[in-house]
From Swiss-Prot:
Its main location: cytoplasm. The gene is trmFO. One of its GO terms (cellular component) is cytosol. This is Methylenetetrahydrofolate--tRNA-(uracil-5-)-methyltransferase TrmFO. It is found in: Cytoplasm. Its EC number is 2.1.1.74.
Length: 448
């Protein structure tokens, strides 16, 4: 297939990946037609018509370079990511993590793209894959059925899916502050989380209620299949009575404050279990229940989650919801630049490619956008080295075992190992990986 001679590039979908791709293309002096159907047609999960809306959590996760996602974010900052830049401008306290005021952040991304002189925003649903120009498809895990059929047809591959869930958000003014305390795990960073401690008796009663609560129904033809990073809390609870104690209710590093007077198990300094609440907006009036993605019926959510100490009278401004997410057989269908193997004028980006997470989705849009622009200019594709986070992620999703392919978060396990003797200290090893990654990325920057 010959390269398109159009004078612009299409980007379909203005989520995190599409927004990033559109910006990276326009930054390189190429006109962009950015299509977004929200405003014309709603999705089951989005609440606004803003671009790059965050629907599951307001957290971009850890910020340290000894954390793989922290490294990925730093690489993206150096590549002038619109998502990272606007995220930084709308940060809210979150200890050692990066969390944002989701409304302020999405509005600022939207405004920047809508006001860009080279970006034409078109509010319309796309049901056919355009063949008039180089196109980046970033319609996300909630891709409409009509377009999903065309994507499957053009790729000649089967679609996959998994379920994704969002946590409830509560009104801070309805939290009983006498029963909770402010602290970040291990006192890392500023004290940014409200902690709801549980005794063993309280936890056992909560576990019983959670595992017997009624879930919202699924379509009978859909087999449940969850991505581990966004698993419903009730599914986790059913895996074992202590599973949550090693997950979102882990008490380690969240000791009682000296002035705590509530119930506790004997003289223990650490609660048996802890539910954490994280600030969800800049005003600090909303908090989400960390790790409590759920598919329980709304009435059951209210009944069960009000058993959490401090939330007995909590007001839920949004209940948890679950939706089906689609993703592609990327190992067979895409190259490391997220370019279609069967149609070189077509790129894909975002969670539909099998990257998992906000930051990872934006990173895939960055890679696809840069390479769509390079194709437009008839320049050689830019493949970031596997020593970097932004290079290792697309390499993983396009080289994984297709038969067992599952969505993947960025992690140090997929980054190329260091040469020489293994550094035994994990922190030092990760620091060395990060140092090498940023040095190698700086070499790539010279090509841009």
């Amino acid at each position: 297939m010959s390269q398109s001679t159009a004078t612009y590039i299409n980007v379909i979908g203005a989520g995190l990946a599409g927004s990033e791709a559109a910006y990276q293309i326009a930054k390189r002096g190429i006109p962009v037609k950015l299509y977004e159907m929200r405003g014309v047609k709603a999705t089951p999960q989005h609440k606004t018509t803003n671009f790059a809306e965050l629907v599951c959590s307001n957290s971009f996760r850890g910020d340290s370079l000894t954390n793989a996602v922290g490294l990925l974010k730093e690489e993206m900052r150096r590549l002038d990511s619109i998502i990272m830049r606007n995220g930084e401008a709308n940060r809210v306290p979150a200890g050692g993590a990066m969390a944002v005021d989701r409304e302020g952040y999405a509005k600022s991304v939207t405004a920047e793209l809508e006001n860009h002189p080279l970006i034409e925003v078109i509010r319309d649903e796309i049901t056919e894959i355009p063949n008039d120009a180089i196109t980046v498809i970033a319609t996300g895990p909630l891709t409409s059925d009509a377009l999903a059929e065309k994507i499957h047809a053009v790729n000649g591959g089967d679609g996959f899916y998994f379920y994704d869930a969002a946590a409830p958000i509560i009104d801070k003014s309805t939290i009983d502050m006498s029963k909770v305390y402010l602290k970040s795990r291990y006192d890392k960073g500023e004290a940014a989380y409200l902690n709801c401690p549980m005794t063993k008796e309280e936890f056992m009663a909560f576990h019983e209620a959670l595992t017997t609560a009624e879930e919202a129904p699924l379509n009978s033809f859909e087999k449940e299949k969850y991505f581990e990073g966004c698993m419903p809390i009730e599914v986790m609870a059913k895996r074992g009575i202590k599973t949550m104690l090693y997950g979102p209710m882990k008490p380690v590093g969240l000791e009682y404050p000296d002035d705590y007077t509530g119930p506790r198990d004997g003289e223990f300094k650490t609660p048996y279990a802890v539910v954490q609440l994280r600030q969800d907006n800049a005003a600090g009036s909303l908090y989400n229940i960390v790790g409590f993605q759920t598919h329980l019926k709304w009435g059951e959510q209210k009944r069960v989650f009000q058993m959490i100490p401090g939330l007995e009278n909590a007001e839920f401004v949004r209940y948890g919801v679950m939706h089906r997410n689609s993703y592609m057989d990327s190992p067979n269908l895409l190259t490391e630049t997220f370019q279609s193997r069967s149609n070189p004028n077509l790129f894909f980006a975002g969670q539909m490619t099998g990257v998992e997470g906000y930051v990872e989705s934006a990173a895939s849009g960055l890679v696809a956008g840069i390479n769509a622009a390079r194709l437009f200019k008839r320049e050689e594709a830019l493949i970031f080295p596997q020593t970097t986070a932004i290079g290792s992620l697309p390499h993983y999703v396009t080289h994984a075992d297709s038969k067992h392919f599952q969505p993947m978060n960025v992690n140090f396990g997929i980054i190329k190992e260091l040469e020489g003797p293994r550094i035994r200290d994990k922190k030092e090893r990760y620091e060395a990986i990060a140092s090498r990654a940023l040095a190698d990325l700086d070499t790539c920057l010279a090509l841009l």
